[in-house]
């Protein structure tokens, strides 16, 4: 006789456009607990990968960067990278360590903050995710714990077509002005 308390919960499916992918939504955890995905190779079964092999957003999220550079995924547009080094060899250190906001514009109507967070979970720790729908324009603001995670999202998702809409992604500059005390 099976015990009722030991049944595993059925995980909610994740949708990428008209395709549905099974998986857990949330932060990855220890493999011993079995409460989250354990490796990149086990994220999707072969049937799902075969169905989504021509989906540009899925490919950008799952293919290694080298394959993207080699042209397996066709780039919609080429933009200069937001690197921290300038042409004269100088680097920028300010702003590297803190949390960074990414704005994703032109999302499909009906997209929720949970949808966005689940899609971007592979890029890094998400501190906050909000979706605003203003007059039919859906826009997400996602706060990542590191600048590197935010830059990776912009690099992979800017210009990608998702759910029939071409996404626009950029890093939001911090507009807070710091006050200096005069003595």
From Swiss-Prot:
Database matches in SMART domains: RRM
MF (Gene Ontology): mRNA binding
A Pfam short name: RRM_1
Any single GO CC term annotated in Swiss-Prot or TrEMBL for this entry: nucleus
Localization (cell): Nucleus, Nucleolus
Residue runs in coiled coils: none
Keyword annotations from UniProtKB, A to Z: Nucleus, RNA-binding
Residue ranges occupied by any RRM domain in the UniProt entry: 100-174
Annotated spans, Disordered: 1-36
Organism superkingdom: Eukaryota
InterPro entries, sorted: Nucleotide-bd_a/b_plait_sf (IPR012677), RBD_domain_sf (IPR035979), RRM_dom (IPR000504)
Protein name, entry field: Uncharacterized RNA-binding protein C126.11c
Organism: Schizosaccharomyces pombe (strain 972 / ATCC 24843)
């Amino acid at each position: 006789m099976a015990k009722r308390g030991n049944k595993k919960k059925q995980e909610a499916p994740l949708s990428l456009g008209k395709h549905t992918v099974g998986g857990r939504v949330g932060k990855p955890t220890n493999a011993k607990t079995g409460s989250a995905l354990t490796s990149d190779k086990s994220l999707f079964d072969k049937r799902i990968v075969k169905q989504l092999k021509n989906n540009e957003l899925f490919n950008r999220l799952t293919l290694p960067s080298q394959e993207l550079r080699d042209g397996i995924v066709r780039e919609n547009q080429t933009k200069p990278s937001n690197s921290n080094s300038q042409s004269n060899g100088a680097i920028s250190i300010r702003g590297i360590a803190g949390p960074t906001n990414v704005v994703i514009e032109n999302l499909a109507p009906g997209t929720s903050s949970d949808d966005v967070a689940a899609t971007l979970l592979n890029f890094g720790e998400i501190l906050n995710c909000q979706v605003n729908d203003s007059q039919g324009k859906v826009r997400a603001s996602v706060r990542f714990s590191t600048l590197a995670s935010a830059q990776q999202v912009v690099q992979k998702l800017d210009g990608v077509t998702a759910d029939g809409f071409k996404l626009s992604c950029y890093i939001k500059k911090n507009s807070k002005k710091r006050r200096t005390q005069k003595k």
